[in-house]
Amino acid sequence: KLEAEARVLARCPDAVALRLPWMYDLPGYHLPIRGNLPLNILKASKTGEVLHFSRNDYRGVSYVREVIENLVPAMELPGGVYNFGSECDGDMVETARCFANLLQVDVKIEESDLTRNLAMDTGKLRAYGIEFSSTWGALRVCLGDYRLGYLM
């Protein structure tokens, strides 16, 4: 990916590359939705499935509608590579537990030993006036959009 970004920018310095995170939405707009963090948590709470996350896994998880809303201002960005999504608030165990808490469900989470850091720093975007909610804040926005704010 890094090589592809470098090659594109070498040929077209005005190109804009957006690095996207894991995204989610909830059912309700009659669009197909693949598995995502809140739906995986809701499913596991119903089925008793054990979910596995690591305290050494850092990544932002973004509400897709917030990503879409920020695409329009991104059209004005100068050439370059940008992290385009929510910054993480904690490791994935903390994030999964926060999501379960906000969704008001009990879910079994076992810790795995995966080590990965896909955390995004969106400071470069903020310098151009484009902002994202944090991972945990974005779920609050999502629940409000679907009028599920009573869960918070």
Language model features: what each stretch is:
Residues 46, 65-76, 140-143:
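Two-component system phosphotransfer/interaction surface
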Residues 7-58, 66:
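NAD(P)-dependent short-chain dehydrogenase/reductase
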Residues 10-15, 47, 75-80, 101-105, ...:
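Short glycine/proline-enriched coil/turn segments at helix->beta-strand junctions
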Residues 68-71, 76-117, 121-122, 150-152:
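Mid/C-terminal beta-alpha module of Rossmann-like enzyme folds, strongest
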Residues 59-62, 90, 120, 130-133:
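Residue-level signal for the nucleotide or nucleotide-sugar donor/cofactor binding architecture
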Residues 135-152:
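Amphipathic terminal alpha-helices
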Residues 2-6:
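Active-site helix adjacent to the Tyr-X3-Lys
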